[in-house]
Curated annotation (Swiss-Prot):
Enzyme class of the recorded protein, top EC level: transferase
A GO BP annotation: protein ubiquitination
Any one GO cellular component localisation term in the record: site of double-strand break
Subcellular locations according to the entry: Nucleus
Motif (UMI motif): 145-153
Keyword rRNA processing: no
HAMAP family named in the record: RNF168 (MF_03066)
Biased segments, Basic and acidic residues type: 429-443
Zinc finger residue extent: RING-type: 16-55
Protein name as it appears in the record: E3 ubiquitin-protein ligase rnf168
Gene behind the chain: rnf168
Function (record text): E3 ubiquitin-protein ligase required for accumulation of repair proteins to sites of DNA damage. Acts with ube2n/ubc13 to amplify the rnf8-dependent histone ubiquitination. Recruited to sites of DNA damage at double-strand breaks (DSBs) by binding to ubiquitinated histone H2A and ubiquitinates histone H2A and H2AX, leading to amplify the rnf8-dependent H2A ubiquitination and promoting the formation of 'Lys-63'-linked ubiquitin conjugates. This leads to concentrate ubiquitinated histones H2A and H2AX at DNA lesions to the threshold required for recruitment of tp53bp1 and brca1.
Subunit structure: Monomer.
Alphabetized UniProt keyword annotations: Chromatin regulator, DNA damage, DNA repair, Metal-binding, Nucleus, Transferase, Ubl conjugation pathway, Zinc, Zinc-finger
């Protein structure tokens, strides 16, 4: 509430600036503007809860004071009543004072907004709200970035822990693998040592000590190298000849076996040393295929053991694997060729005596040379026949492929022909009733034209009438083919005959009806005269 000035109050302060009359129950707004209660009710409450002079919003103040009934400035109202009781009484009774117009003083100038002032206020408010919103978004973005960085740091720490754990597991696994490899290598060494220490089974021929030492050294030291770089057949033959030279005087040629369990005897077929020195390249080493099979089986077992050992120790490479595969394929081819040679030789020698003394086995140098040449020729013939066999096999494969393709095409053509035949049968079964087709629908001719034709051309008496069967179908005669359709001309003539007979029947019936029909028409005088004249 505004402070009331001391007495006496000037007349200008007791006049309402809106109605220009004395203040009746004055209301002092928070902006220090005063107006009477009726003007406040009309302008502020009904129009807008703002001051009519400065446009300050007074909605909260008005609701609060109207609730407590303290809108009227009672102190100012009491002062005005004491100073101007007559004017207050007139205003309360509704009478207008005459002397108010003469005593008008200067009213406060209404305050108006400058051009663009409201727009500036609006833009300032909008910019303020926008700045607050951007500041809030920036704060939220910073908080989210901090949270994301925290999560990333936690994930990175977890990944590091996981990587360390996996690395430890890998290291432990490697250690375990190394221990296992050491154990396996120790077992392999023990097994090799036991194999070398085991004496061979009782046999007819005994190998000399020097050959045993050579074999044990070769087995212990060159297990893997023997498979990685296989020896040619000539070297094997020379090695076998040297072994036979160091053996007993019986002259038997002994092949080195991996297991040394069975050492079969061979017939003395080795040539003399001079011939071997001269033809070291050409002569093959005599051997038995069974021994070779046993040797290859033992070699394959040692191969697998050596490969496992290399894999466990981590020294097995791609080049070694390729060499092993190549050596295996070469050994297999060699085994097949040698088995064929041996079969041919055994077939040729089956008619000769199997056992002879050592002295009778040796032939002359010329005969030996001829036998060596014959063996060489056999080898060459086998080597020449092998590509021929491969060519024939390729031709057979091509012929089989061509035959298979031809049969496949014939089956495809047969299925296609069956499909076409089905479609053709379906088309033949369907009856075409379209215009211009042989089975088209016959249109009814006009009745007047038919009657004229019937009257112009009377039917002959000897014409054969169509006979109807039980199904109602007309038959002009017997036809052997039941499915044969009647011709178009016959069907037209039969329809004409039926129509002409119907017309004659209708004419006769109409004449009879005219005779029998009673005359409902009243007779005229002329009819009566005609009847009387007729009688």
């Amino acid at each position: 509430m505004a402070k009331v000035q001391k007495l006496p109050l000037p007349w200008s302060e007791c006049i309402c600036p809106i109605c220009q009359e004395i203040l009746l129950e004055p209301v002092t707004l928070p902006c220090k503007h005063t107006l009477c209660n009726p003007c406040f009710q009309m302008t502020v409450e009904k129009a807008s809860l703002c001051c009519p002079f400065c446009r300050k919003r007074v909605s909260t103040w008005a609701r609060q004071h109207s609730r407590t009934r303290t809108l009227v400035n009672k102190e100012l109202w009491e002062v005005i009543q004491k100073q101007y009781p007559k004017q207050c009484q007139r205003r309360a009774s509704g009478q207008e004072s005459d002397d108010l117009s003469d005593e008008l003083t200067s009213c406060p100038v209404p305050v108006l907004c400058k051009p663009g002032e409201i727009r500036q206020e609006y833009e300032a408010e909008v910019s303020k709200i926008e700045a607050e919103r951007t500041a809030q978004e920036e704060a939220e973005r910073k908080a989210s970035e901090d949270y994301i960085q925290k999560l990333l740091a936690e994930e990175e720490a977890e990944e590091n822990l996981h990587a360390e754990a996996s690395q430890r597991e890998i290291e432990e696994q490697l250690k375990r693998d190394e221990e296992l490899a050491r154990l396996l290598s120790g077992d392999m060494d023990l097994s090799n040592a036991s194999c070398t220490s085991v004496s061979p089974v009782t046999s007819k021929k005994v190998v000399s000590k020097s050959s045993k030492i050579v074999k044990s050294k070769q087995r212990v030291s060159g297990d893997i190298e023997r498979f990685l770089s296989p020896k040619p057949r000539r070297a094997l033959a020379a090695f076998g000849i040297n072994e036979s030279r160091n053996s007993d005087t019986s002259g038997s040629c002994i092949l080195l076996d991996e297991d040394e369990d069975e050492i079969p005897d061979l017939s003395p077929q080795c040539p003399s040393t001079s011939l071997i020195q001269e033809r070291d390249v050409e002569l093959p080493m005599p051997y038995l295929p069974n021994c070779y099979k046993l040797e290859s089986d033992a070699a394959s077992q040692q191969d697998s053991c050596s490969e496992r050992n290399d894999i466990c120790n981590g020294t097995y490479s791609c080049s070694d694997s390729i060499d092993v595969e190549v050596s295996k394929t070469m050994e297999q081819q060699r085994a097949t060729a040698d088995s064929q040679e041996y079969r041919m030789e055994t077939n040729a020698m089956s008619y000769s005596t199997p056992k002879r003394k050592c002295e009778e086995c040796y032939l002359d140098i010329e005969e030996k040379a001829g036998s060596c040449q014959s063996v060489k020729k056999k080898k060459l013939s086998l080597s020449e026949d092998s590509p021929v066999l491969s060519v024939h096999a390729g031709k057979f494969i091509e012929l089989e492929e061509n035959l298979y393709e031809r049969r496949k095409q014939e089956e495809h053509d047969r299925l296609f022909a069956l499909q076409l035949q089905r479609e053709l049968d379906k088309e033949l079964k369907q009856v075409n009733r379209g215009k211009g087709s042989p089975d088209e629908y016959q249109l009814r001719p006009k009745r007047g034209l038919k009657l004229q034709e019937c009257n112009d051309s009377p039917l002959p008496h000897n014409e054969q009438t169509p006979v109807q069967d039980k199904g109602g179908n007309t038959q002009s005669g017997y036809s052997p083919d039941e499915n044969k359709k009647p011709s178009r001309k016959k069907s037209i003539t039969s329809s004409q005959v039926r129509q002409s007979r119907a017309v004659t029947n209708t004419e006769r019936s109409s004449e009879g009806m005219n005779v029998l029909k009673p005359s409902n028409k009243q007779p005229t005088i002329l009819d009566l005269f005609q009847r009387s004249a007729g009688k």
